[in-house]
């Protein structure tokens, strides 16, 4: 009984009632403890079960995803009818009318290239939904076409032995889901739409999310809680991988807010060769843009030889799944030049099955970083790289210790007690090798970690603690120590 009650207190630190129990008579204490045990045990066990089911199973799903090697991205939505990837958000649904749409043609084109899956843009940044949604009138059901495109896609790809993935944009300019003006009803719309997509179309292998915590969308993981959305997806489909297209911001050797690292190669994003290998997705269009343009039928597409030798093969060797975008035209069909290129790719490249086995990975960070812009202190800093650079949410700036300091330290001061259970120390390059992590409990510094860790991304997960300060004391480094981001999280586990 005491062990379980202690665990409950760690899991639910807000139960301050227990602090007063010692003042009561033994029989009353025993009665109250028994009542709490009965009421909270199912919640505790469920939380423990959810936590224990993630780690090794997620690693298995990550490996399976990388082993798929090659798939088809299908950008097909309102931009198809505008000759622009970002159309007018007030564009009329009357424009969307793919009279000859044939999802079976898409699937067979993917098969001809030896692809293993497809991923369709269910909603892009302008907010038009191409499934039968109850969340808005701005959908395919109010267009002249009036048919559920997502259903046709899912049915056709499964019928051809291909796996099904979906793309969804958090940024929604039609419904004004934009930075600095997101209301609770906007978040409910997002949850409703994701629930529809994950309950109406069978097993979804992965969900690619876009327009979230990107420099151009500026919707943060606090504006729309990543942890809430991630947990909703896992509740609806526990084996659905969550991929946020955030590779431009976060370090390549850490899983931040995604189950799979992602890189949009057309935006200049590339995997670093000198960091720890991660399960990865890279994407690029076969044409010059993501959505169909009027010149696509007559402009040459990517050469099959280059697709195979410069993209599929080297990316697969780096534990990276490559997804090639092939945009259907306004009739809902893939153009002949793209079909021919895909068929040639299939002649040049065969899927040889599993890739190199990945090393086991920690679960991704999904909670908000409570250290961002909190008051920071440190030992003597380099004049141009002060302590505030280590928690500014900018991975390209760093706090740097003054070289004269023999025992450098860095500290976050929350000014009040906060609960947390995860700390990440990120360096621009691996340098710090030995250190201590401690927190202030109001009376003394308590130790979280003391030892060696030469990784560039130093991830520490531990039982939840309460403290008003947290610090690192650096005891060993190859050169003058610096920290790009000192991060603190309170994860739900």
Enumerate the predicted regions with their spans.
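Asp-box/BNR beta-propeller loop motif
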Residues: 24, 442-447
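Bacterial Sec-dependent N-terminal signal peptides
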Residues: 1-49
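Short beta-strand segments and strand-loop junctions that repeat across beta-rich extracellular domains
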Residues: 434-444, 468-471
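Core-facing hydrophobic residues within beta-strands of well-ordered domains
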Residues: 204, 418-420, 432, 445, ...
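Solvent-exposed strand-loop boundary residues in beta-sheet-rich modules
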Residues: 429, 441-443, 478, 492
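Mature catalytic domains of secreted/periplasmic carbohydrate-active enzymes
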Residues: 12, 48-376, 380, 424-427, ...
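Disordered, acidic Ser/Thr/Pro-rich linker "stalks" and the adjacent N-terminal cap
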Residues: 351-416, 420, 426-435, 450-451, ...
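Extracellular carbohydrate recognition
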Residues: 477-483
């Amino acid at each position: 009984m005491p062990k379980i009650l202690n665990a409950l207190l760690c899991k639910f630190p807000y139960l301050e009632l227990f602090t007063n129990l010692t003042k009561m008579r033994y029989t009353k204490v025993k009665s109250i403890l028994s009542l709490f045990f009965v009421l909270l045990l199912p919640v505790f066990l469920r939380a423990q079960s959810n936590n224990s089911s993630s780690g090794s199973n997620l690693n298995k799903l990550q490996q399976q995803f990388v082993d798929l090697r090659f798939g088809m991205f299908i950008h097909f939505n309102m931009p198809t009818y505008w000759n622009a990837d970002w159309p007018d958000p007030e564009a009329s649904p009357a424009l969307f009318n793919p009279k000859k749409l044939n999802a079976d043609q898409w699937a067979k084109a993917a098969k001809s290239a030896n692809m293993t899956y497809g991923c369709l843009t269910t909603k892009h940044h302008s907010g038009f939904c191409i499934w039968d949604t109850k969340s808005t009138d701005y959908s395919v059901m109010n267009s002249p076409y009036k048919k559920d495109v997502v259903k046709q896609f899912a049915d056709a790809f499964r019928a051809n032995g291909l796996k099904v993935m979906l793309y969804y944009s958090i940024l929604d300019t039609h419904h004004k889901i934009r930075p600095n003006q997101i209301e609770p009803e906007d978040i409910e719309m997002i949850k409703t739409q994701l629930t529809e997509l994950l309950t109406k179309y069978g097993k979804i292998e992965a969900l690619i999310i876009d327009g979230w915590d990107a420099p151009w969308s500026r919707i943060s993981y606090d504006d729309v809680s990543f942890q809430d959305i991630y947990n909703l997806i896992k509740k609806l489909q526990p084996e659905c991988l969550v991929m946020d297209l955030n590779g431009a911001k976060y370090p390549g050797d850490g899983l931040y807010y995604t189950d799979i690292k992602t890189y949009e190669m057309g935006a200049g994003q590339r995997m670093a060769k000198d960091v720890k290998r991660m399960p990865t997705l890279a994407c690029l269009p076969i044409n010059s843009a993501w959505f169909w343009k009027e010149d696509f039928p007559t402009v040459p597409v990517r050469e099959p030889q280059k697709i195979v030798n410069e993209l599929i093969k080297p990316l697969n060797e780096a534990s990276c799944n490559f997804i090639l975008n092939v945009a259907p035209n306004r009739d809902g069909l893939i153009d002949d030049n793209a079909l021919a290129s895909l068929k040639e790719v299939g002649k040049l490249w065969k899927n040889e099955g599993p890739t190199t086995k990945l090393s086991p990975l920690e679960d991704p960070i999904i909670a908000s970083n409570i250290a961002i812009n909190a008051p920071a202190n440190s030992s003597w800093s380099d004049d141009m790289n002060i302590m505030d650079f280590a928690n500014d949410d900018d991975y390209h700036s760093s706090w740097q210790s003054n070289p004269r300091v023999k025992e450098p330290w860095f500290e976050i001061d929350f000014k009040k007690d906060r609960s947390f259970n995860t700390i990440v120390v990120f360096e621009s390059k691996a340098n710090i090798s030995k250190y201590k992590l401690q927190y202030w409990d109001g009376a003394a510094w308590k130790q979280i970690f003391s030892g060696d860790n030469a990784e560039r991304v130093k991830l520490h997960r531990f039982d939840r603690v309460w403290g008003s300060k947290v610090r690192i004391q650096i005891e060993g480094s190859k050169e003058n120590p610096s920290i790009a981001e000192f991060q603190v999280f309170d994860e739900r586990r």
